[in-house]
Curated annotation (Swiss-Prot):
It holds the Pfam family PYNP_C. Belongs to the thymidine/pyrimidine-nucleoside phosphorylase family. Homodimer. The enzymes which catalyze the reversible phosphorolysis of pyrimidine nucleosides are involved in the degradation of these compounds and in their utilization as carbon and energy sources, or in the rescue of pyrimidine bases for nucleotide synthesis. The keyword Glycosyltransferase applies. GO terms for cellular component: cytosol. Keywords: Glycosyltransferase, Transferase. It catalyses: thymidine + phosphate = 2-deoxy-alpha-D-ribose 1-phosphate + thymine. Disulfide bonds: none annotated. This is Thymidine phosphorylase. PROSITE patterns: THYMID_PHOSPHORYLASE. The keyword Hydrolase does not apply.
């Protein structure tokens, strides 16, 4: 029998907790046997004294097991269960293409996603822009769509990882969100509760990233790769660039449109293509669906070019309650804002740098993101045709197009966009879309 306060004392004093102590405490979080004050105290003790890798694995698996752990065996799936998770960014619409692409190559993708908060967009908010799409279906419907279509992108259900829900809300209010150990356990407990065979992790780097520096992003990526592999899920973490908007747009309906244009081949932003292919190829390799990277990329290009990935996206949308002709007629269904107008820079030259976080916050100001959980969204607003770093900018070249509902909102966003995109006389050095892969063999 353990005492919560003794576990807190041990961690406060910088000692390692045993697996049994961690399991006891996490069970107490779930059953309310541990108080809010005790959870906050442990969070702060971990923040200052950290956890070793064994502790991180124990915390992650205990939180995973605090609620329902999905079981796919009864469905008789004839391929691996694979997934991707991103630490979040601006214009990060990858999941919408990657899920159907991986499914078209023989994987099963039960993707449990989140809503946006702060400057980052949420995958679920994009799907909420599609009329009828159920982001919170019954578990029966979720399983049916995964089996029949190969991919279902939905929100976290109430019985999945309840310990994380309670722990996270307390961390959010007690300044302990930024602990690498606690971030690792929070992210992975949700993903591992889906009983994945393999996971590709997208850790963003740069001005629009969650972590403030490259070093912090790399530390998080290494922690996630080590803990996930240690918990028995084949995982690779990629460090990818978020020093500019990833897609050509940022918002909800506008990103859904870009995802469909990508899947159908109408338009593929080269940076978005590079990161999507890197992550998706890694999923196929880890899941045993490709012999090497060249094979994985060839398979992915094939399902893009023959329309199979776009077809699967359409089947997922209709399977979860959306329109059956959504891919073909998306413009009929997606909401449009009242004002759609370009914004121009005050100087000429090259797009030199971008405060990506500020561009994300401009979307929030327009009404396309949340200042606090529970805020209602306007799915029609956002930015499109956002310039890329290195683009030549003159008086006739917009740096972005703003989708707004009022002149006042447009003016606010225009000022924010102009401030966030820095124009210089010289072009910046080109940076890679993917900085590094952290595989199990690198740990």
């Amino acid at each position: 029998m353990f005492l919560a306060q003794e576990i807190i004392r041990k961690k406060r004093n910088g000692l390692a907790l045993s697996t049994e102590e961690i399991q006891f405490f996490v069970k107490g979080i779930t059953t309310n046997a541990v108080s809010e004050g005790q959870i906050a105290a442990l969070g702060m003790a971990v923040y200052f004294n950290d956890m070793n890798m064994d502790e991180r694995i124990a915390l992650t698996t205990a939180m995973r097991d605090s609620g329902t752990v999905l079981n796919w065996q009864s469905l008789g799936l004839n391929g691996p269960v694979i997934d991707k998770h991103s630490t979040g960014g601006v214009g990060d619409v990858i999941s919408l293409m990657l899920g159907p692409m991986a499914a078209a190559c023989g994987g099963y993708v039960p993707m449990i996603s989140g809503r946006g908060l702060g400057h980052t967009g949420g995958t679920l908010d994009k799907f909420d822009a599609i009329p009828g799409y159920q982001t919170e279906p019954s578990s029966e419907l979720f399983r049916k769509v995964v089996k029949d279509v190969g991919v279902a992108i939905i929100g976290q259900t109430g019985d999945l990882v309840p310990a994380d829900k309670r722990f996270y809300s307390i961390r959010d209010n007690t300044a302990t969100v930024e602990s690498i150990s606690l971030i690792t356990a929070s992210i992975l407990s949700k993903k591992l509760a889906c009983s994945l065979d393999a996971l590709a992790m997208d850790v963003k780097v740069g001005s629009g990233a969650f972590m403030p520096t490259y070093e912090a992003s790399e530390e998080l990526a290494r922690s996630i790769a080590a803990v996930a592999n240690g918990a028995g899920t084949k995982t690779t973490a990629l460090l990818t660039d978020m020093n500019q908007v990833l897609a050509s747009c940022a918002g909800n309906a506008v990103e859904v449109k870009e995802a469909i244009d990508f899947l159908t081949g109408a338009y593929r932003n080269p940076r978005l293509y590079a990161v999507t292919m890197g992550l998706c190829a890694e999923m196929l390799l880890l899941g045993g669906l490709a012999s090497d990277e060249a094979d994985a990329r060839a398979k992915l290009n094939r399902v893009l070019d023959n329309g199979r990935a776009a077809e699967i996206f359409g089947k997922m949308v209709s399977g979860l309650g959306g329109p059956v002709d959504f891919v073909e007629n998306y413009s009929k269904y997606l909401p449009q804002s009242q004002i759609i107008r370009p914004v121009f820079a005050d100087t000429q030259g090259y797009a030199y740098s971008m405060d990506t976080r500020e561009l994300g916050l401009a979307v929030v100001t327009l009404g396309g993101g949340r200042r606090k959980p529970g805020d209602a969204l306007d799915y029609s607003v956002g930015l499109t045709q956002v310039c890329a770093l290195g683009d030549k900018i003159d008086a006739s070249t917009p740096i972005a197009v703003i989708h707004a509902q009022s002149e006042e909102a447009f003016a606010q966003a225009e000022e924010a966009v102009k401030k966030a995109i820095h124009i210089d006389e010289v072009a910046p050095e080109k940076t890679p879309e993917i900085y590094a892969y952290i595989r199990a063999s690198d740990l």
